[in-house]
Amino acid sequence: YMDYTNCRDSIHKSELSLPGGTLPLGAEVQQLVFNFNCTPLRDMYFVKLKVINKSLLVWDSTYISNMNDIDIGASSDDAVGCDSLKDISFTYNFYNSDNDYGTNPPAVGVRFLQSPLVHTGNNSDTAKLPYDTLIGYKVTGMSGFIRVIEGTCLGDLDEAPIAYNFMRGKDGCGNALINWVTGRPTTYVYSGNACSHSGWYDSSSGDRRGLANSGPFTMNSGDTQIVVLSYMITRDGGNNLQNVCALQSLSDSALKYYYNDFKTCVPIGIEPISSEIPQRYELLQNYPNPFNPMTKLRFSIPLSRGVAE
């Protein structure tokens, strides 16, 4: 399945909430949505965004953000979080029972498989892509995750300044966010361990929306940036919290397939063929040249079996 979308700027009103009411930037966004009909990738789909600066202006301090309003069954009992090391944001059911899913409701996550590239010129910086590893570049990754809730500074993205503040990893009023556990400024809300409910995690249920950000970077006129996201769902963990751990593991699998350019649809890894351990081995002298049609290859096996020539 593939879905192609070609987006371009058009004038929109400020009350259109999520766009933030900005004027046209001169951006072109080409979107490709795809998935694979095979077991390892059955619980995920992928979104590739190609963003082109078609204007004559330089976009300074640019961010690309992914806004999601995910409801795990009923919308009133969800929680959100993120893993800043894996570049993933997620939504899960706060309780292990849901009116729609019943027990063991799934977790849903979105991971940045590829984020905007920044040229540093430093040979120690590398950016891994499916087809190459770029020297002197780095990826911006998921630079922040924001939970959007009701309130003056934490509410919807109704205006451009509010939207941009959220994208920078601040609240809508431009204030730094504080990790409630460490007491230090952060751009990652609920970055604790949701599986074990340790660190800073979402400690109450409700209708949740989340904004995952990547930036800042500069786009000159004519520049192109590519972002690839994987959307995943799983209930393999066994309960609402452990499903978050299973989701993080599933996202690692998605990243491996992406780096392999989706060339194969078999599990990545080594599968044991046999549990038997050889007692010894012997390399016989197959002389003359084995490619000579007159050469006979000697071999032996420890069991008495018929062997077809």
Describe each region flagged by the PLM.
Residues E271-Y287, F291-E309:
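Glycine-centered coil/turn sites that cap beta-strands in beta-rich domains
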Residues T218-M232:
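Short Pro-Gly-centered flexible turn/kink motifs
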Residues V51-L56, I233:
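Asparagine-centered strand-capping/turn motif at beta-strand->loop junctions
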Residues D60-S203:
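Glycine-rich (often Gly-Gly/Gly-Pro-rich) flexible segments and glycine-rich loop motifs
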Residues M44-F46, M232-P267:
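Terminal connector regions
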Residues D202-L211:
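Short, structured beta-strand/loop micro-motifs enriched in basic residues and often containing a Trp
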Residues Y1-K48:
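Extended, loop-rich substrate-binding clefts of extracytoplasmic carbohydrate-active enzymes
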